[in-house]
Amino acid sequence: MIHVAIIAGGKGERFWPFSTRENPKQLLKIASDKTMLEETLDRVADFVPLEQTVIVTGENIRKQILERHPSLKESNILAEPFGKNTCLAVGFAAIHLHKKDPNGVMIVLSADHYIKPKERLIDILRFGAAIAERDDVLITLGINPTRPETGYGYIELGEQYDSFDGLISFRVKQFKEKPNRTLAQQYYIGRMHMWNSGMFIWSAKSILNAISRCKPEMYKLLTDYAETIGTPGEANARLELFEKAEGVSIDVGVLEEANNVVVIKADLIWDDIGSWLALERISPKDKDNNVSIGDTILHESFEISTVNSGDGILATLGVSDLVIVKTNSVVLVAHKTRVNDIKSLLARMKDDPRYDQYL
């Protein structure tokens, strides 16, 4: 059987002040009139039924997720007591799935991606699921670069692995960390590197075996926890799991070490919606190359992105190359070249208790 695990943790700090600790970006309407999580659920609804879908998220937003998405039930939520990066999030979902369906295939999606068209995504997932059911491999979806991007990790293609109906998979030769501008340009021109999308397909058995090889301590914690699932001791065991397990990404912790990784060339329109700069790539622009969301008036302003989610209007005059975000309690004004440094601003705010209510 095919299952979906949607990773919906994280604080979305680079979307502050729209995204906050108690209202992170996966619960916000950024790319459409639906929340990011709702968009993700809709993408796979015609392929995998909701009862075979779980959302891995923080306990602190479990209630909000259920309230804003009435179709979801408690059984759809796997709540982490606190975030510990994606290796544990994936392992947490995999151990639950394996207990329920030992031969199950697991599709891992992120709740903060922009993906079009939905139909092509389902074709790709179906192709990958067929491979994962047949072979002991770990599959990642690679995106053809559309620009020399320094903010993404890359995957170097090896020999062809499989193909079907125009879709092709390759052995992964090597994972590459986020490159500098020169390397990114080489990857873009060379066409042998793909963006690492953070979407994966594997059997629960295959990923747990990989964790056991690459992160044996984490695997032992996961299997100890699995013994308590459905018992009165589960909550305490889950807390112990998250307290003791290493905080590492699935890419660094497992995929970069594994020798059975395959990448599918995913011919999709894709963006990871990682920061306010993503709005320029997914939103319509006016004649002055501005992006405007909410009640705004932009006069003699160029190359700016504005978001007004609060009361009143947001007006600009004679400015350029800015990101301006207004809520009912905060206004952020940042130059586009610095908008990815929002975390440094938040770090300063965290040092002063006066600002805690705005985080």
Where are each of the predicted segments found?
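Short beta-strand segments
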Residues: I7-A8, V56, I107-S110, T140-N144, ...
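Conserved core of the sugar-phosphate nucleotidyltransferase
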Residues: K118-P232, N236-L241, V262, H335-K336
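Short histidine/acidic/glycine/proline-rich micro-motifs that form metal-
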Residues: H113-I115, P145, W270
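Residue-level signal for inorganic ion chemistry
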Residues: L37, A93, D112, I155, ...
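Conserved N-terminal catalytic core of the sugar/cofactor nucleotidyltransferase
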Residues: M1-I6, R14-P17, R21, K29-S110, ...
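Short coil/turn connectors at secondary-structure junctions
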Residues: M1-I2, L50-E51, K73-E74, D101-G104, ...
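Left-handed beta-helix
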Residues: A204-L359
